[in-house]
């Protein structure tokens, strides 16, 4: 398997750097000179430059002052530091708000915002779009062919929504294109409920707390519109950049699993995916809960374009906006940086280079503290990451080959979380996906994280927790996948509604019923603290043994061709299936009918993955809290072992021939990882 081409032409190895804001320090020329030398010491080779610099670039309408940016780019380029040049739309100048108040966002309460904050602008506003086009064009004409500029960092952390008259009209036009007629819209939204039928397009407004929120189809389409409008704004930003230099890659930085935007919709406008990672490290006894969730989001971002991504932001130490600003313990910064690389990142980048003297983020972590020199623990941690990335440079571009995929779907999440019932104190969609992902993560199984519309070719195992919404074509793709020999895991509360959030008629799980071989008659919601015992079925096909517990949600299902794996041990559904398997063609469909404890998921997925022939990073059991990942390319595989606990762990290796590259080396067929320790090993590719 060949490696991917470099993300940025003529840039080999990993990128190491982060946000750099020289415009905050123009009155301190000695600081700007020190920055370059300190970057060399920190082993930085890239900066994101100019992210919030609009007023420094255009202090008055039509007056452009690029001289400070010219100097910064020349100084960085001379030092060998490459530049991801930002477009500054994330925070507009006060003169723009004052002269053109229509660019200011209107909140869901119907009130127009004042100037302030950031991303407080309307994506629909023609004036704002024109002003963004002008500044982006100016930047492109001046810098798009500069040898030090390797790509565009478009805006920053898109998010939010606007309810102004311009957006209301744009939403209505979006709906007209989608539904063509009001009759079609009224049927799709089921508006006769509570006499909410629309008789004129002008009656439709965005969901607002003091207005309409009870039509779930409206709520769902509004979220789709907000995503489409944001993607269109992003495309509008990119156009003048690509007109000047079509070969310069573009990206924008995502925010984890931010609920406001469906990030899959950006895949057609971006050349590379990047995201900002800020877990609450040390919030639990071990780092494992945060490590699992972070790993899943890394995999999601890699899966969007199926190639390496950029870790655009992380903190070398702390944030200042979380409830507790907990410092990373010694060794943790290298550990979590390697985790990003292990899951497919070709960069480790930070916010921010130097701590600001004032305003909102003056206490946010940075490489250079207010003390202003390199003699700090955090600076040394950053140096250590730079040294690691230099040693691992041949790994850049290597593939993460996944036999398994877990479905995390934004539209499914929107609909599921908007539904009233069966458990309004928490359906926990994202947590449920993470729990299923975690069972495979603990086994060292590389995974893609995809939405429900992605092709399933090439996978051996697909896990689809709580697939409440099943859009057209999804059931058919799943059936074809299973018939070819794939293993599919479905759960309770799946196949409930269609793409319009209309309930399927004829029995659940709707279009997945025949495939699953079960009929879900009803679902029982439990109060917090309630538990229902579950026991394995005698002679069950997976060979499971023992007893487990279910919590929160228990479906009452009837077998329609499936075989029981486990059954309920109490309540009115005692003896009925709690987990099943249905053989379809050459494959199998598993249906987990209750929210079962982690112990069940571990035992269940260990057997399901083995039967499906899913490859693991190493073919050995991993100690608790240790993660194993593998990247491959050009005939070799890079295995990364990471200990997310504060105690030492010993990892037994399989029979492959391992060569140490970084961290702990193998001894007598095992690697001993200290607390928060890592090991990177090279072995010949399993398949040549």
Swiss-Prot record:
UniProt-annotated catalytic positions: 157, 313
Coiled coil: none
Keyword Zinc: yes
Known uses: Has potential use in hydrolyzing lactose in neutral pH dairy products such as whole milk or whey. Also could be used in milk lactose hydrolysis during pasteurization at high temperatures.
Regulation of this protein's activity per its record: Ca(2+), Mg(2+) and EDTA have little effect on enzyme activity at 1-10 mM. Zn(2+) at 3, 5, 7 or 10 mM inhibits activity by 20%, 30%, 40% and 65%, respectively.
Domain of life per record: Bacteria
Temperature dependency: Optimum temperature is 70 degrees Celsius. Retains 90% of activity when heated at 70 degrees Celsius for 30 minutes. Approximately 48% of lactose in milk is hydrolyzed following treatment with enzyme at 65 degrees Celsius over 60 minutes.
Catalytic activity: Hydrolysis of terminal non-reducing beta-D-galactose residues in beta-D-galactosides
EC number: 3.2.1.23
InterPro entries noted in UniProt: Beta_galactosidase_C (IPR013739), Beta_galactosidase_Trimer (IPR013738), Class_I_gatase-like (IPR029062), Glyco_hydro_42 (IPR003476), Glyco_hydro_42_N (IPR013529), Glyco_hydro_b (IPR013780), Glycoside_hydrolase_SF (IPR017853)
Record keywords: Glycosidase, Hydrolase, Metal-binding, Zinc
pH-activity note: Optimum pH is 5.8. Approximately 80% of activity retained after incubating the enzyme for 40 minutes in buffers ranging from pH 5.0 to pH 10.5.
GO BP annotations listed: galactose metabolic process
Molecular-function GO terms, alphabetical: beta-galactosidase activity; metal ion binding
Residues that coordinate or bind Zn(2+): 122, 162, 164, 167
SUPFAM superfamilies: (Trans)glycosidases (SSF51445), Class I glutamine amidotransferase-like (SSF52317)
Gene Ontology cellular-component annotations: beta-galactosidase complex
Family: Belongs to the glycosyl hydrolase 42 family.
Listed name of the protein: Beta-galactosidase BglY
């Amino acid at each position: 398997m060949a490696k991917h081409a470099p993300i940025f032409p003529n840039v080999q190895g990993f990128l190491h750097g982060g946000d750099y804001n020289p415009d905050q320090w123009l009155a301190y020329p000695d600081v700007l000179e020190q920055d370059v030398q300190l970057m060399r010491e920190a082993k930085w080779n890239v900066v994101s430059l100019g992210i919030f610099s609009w007023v420094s670039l255009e202090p008055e309408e039509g007056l452009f002052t690029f001289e400070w940016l010219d100097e910064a780019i020349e100084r960085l380029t001379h030092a060998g530091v490459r530049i991801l040049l930002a477009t500054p739309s994330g925070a507009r100048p006060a003169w723009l708000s004052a002269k053109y108040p229509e660019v200011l966002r209107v909140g869901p309460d119907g009130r127009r915002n004042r100037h302030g904050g950031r991303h407080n602008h309307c994506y629909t506003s023609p004036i704002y779009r024109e002003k963004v086009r002008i500044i982006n064009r100016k930047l492109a004409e001046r810098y798009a062919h500069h040898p030090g500029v390797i790509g565009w960092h478009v805006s920053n952390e898109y998010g939010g929504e606007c309810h102004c008259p311009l957006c209301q009209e744009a939403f209505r036009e979006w709906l007209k294109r989608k539904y063509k007629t009001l009759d079609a819209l009224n049927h799709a939204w089921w508006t006769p409920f509570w006499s909410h039928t629309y008789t004129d397009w002008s009656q439709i407004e965005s969901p607002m707390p003091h207005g309409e929120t009870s039509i779930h189809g409206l709520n769902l389409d509004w979220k789709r519109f907000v995503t489409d409008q944001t993607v269109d704004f992003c495309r509008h930003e990119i156009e003048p950049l690509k007109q000047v230099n079509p070969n310069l890659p573009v990206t924008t930085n995502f925010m984890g699993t931010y609920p406001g935007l469906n990030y899959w919709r950006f895949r057609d406008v971006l050349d590379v995916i990047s995201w900002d990672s800020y877990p609450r490290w040390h919030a639990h006894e071990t780092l494992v809960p945060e490590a699992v969730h972070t790993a899943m989001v890394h995999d999601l971002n890699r899966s969007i374009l199926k190639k390496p991504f950029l870790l655009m932001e992380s903190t070398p130490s702390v944030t200042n906006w979380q409830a507790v600003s907990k410092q990373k313990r010694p060794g943790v910064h290298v550990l979590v940086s390697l985790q990003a690389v292990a899951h497919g990142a070709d960069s480790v980048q930070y916010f921010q280079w130097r701590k600001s003297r004032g305003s909102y983020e003056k206490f946010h972590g940075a490489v250079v503290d207010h003390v202003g020199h390199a003699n700090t623990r955090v600076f040394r941690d950053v140096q250590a990451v730079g040294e690691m990335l230099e040693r691992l440079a041949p790994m850049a571009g290597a593939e993460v080959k996944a036999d398994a995929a877990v479905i995390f779907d934004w539209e499914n999440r929107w609909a599921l979380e908007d539904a009233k019932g069966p458990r309004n104190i928490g359906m926990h969609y994202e947590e449920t996906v993470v729990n299923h992902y975690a069972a495979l993560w603990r086994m060292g199984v590389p995974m893609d994280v995809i939405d429900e519309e992605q092709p399933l070719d090439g996978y051996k195992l697909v896990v689809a927790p709580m697939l409440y919404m099943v859009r057209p074509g999804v059931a058919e793709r799943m059936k074809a996948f299973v018939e070819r020999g794939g293993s599919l895991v479905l759960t309770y509360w799946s196949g409930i509604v269609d793409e319009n959030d209309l309930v399927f008629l004829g029995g659940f799980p709707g279009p997945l019923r025949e495939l699953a071989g079960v009929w879900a008659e009803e679902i029982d919601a439990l109060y917090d603290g309630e538990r229902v015992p579950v026991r394995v079925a005698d002679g069950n096909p997976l060979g499971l043994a023992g007893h487990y517990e279910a919590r929160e949600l228990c479906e009452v299902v009837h077998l329609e061709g499936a075989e029981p794996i486990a059954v309920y041990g109490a309540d009115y559904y005692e003896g009925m299936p709690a987990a099943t398997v249905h053989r379809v063609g050459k494959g199998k469909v598993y249906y987990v009918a209750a929210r079962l404890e982690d112990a069940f998921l571990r035992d269940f997925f260990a057997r399901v993955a083995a039967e499906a022939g899913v490859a693991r990073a190493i073919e050995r059991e991993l100690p608790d809290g240790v993660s194993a990942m593998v990247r491959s390319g050009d005939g070799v595989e890079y295995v990364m072992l990471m200990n997310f606990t504060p105690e030492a762990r010993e990892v037994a290796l399989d029979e492959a021939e391992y060569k140490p590259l970084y961290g702990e080396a193998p001894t007598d067929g095992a690697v001993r990882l200290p607390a928060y320790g890592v090991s990177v090993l090279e072995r010949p590719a399993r398949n040549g």
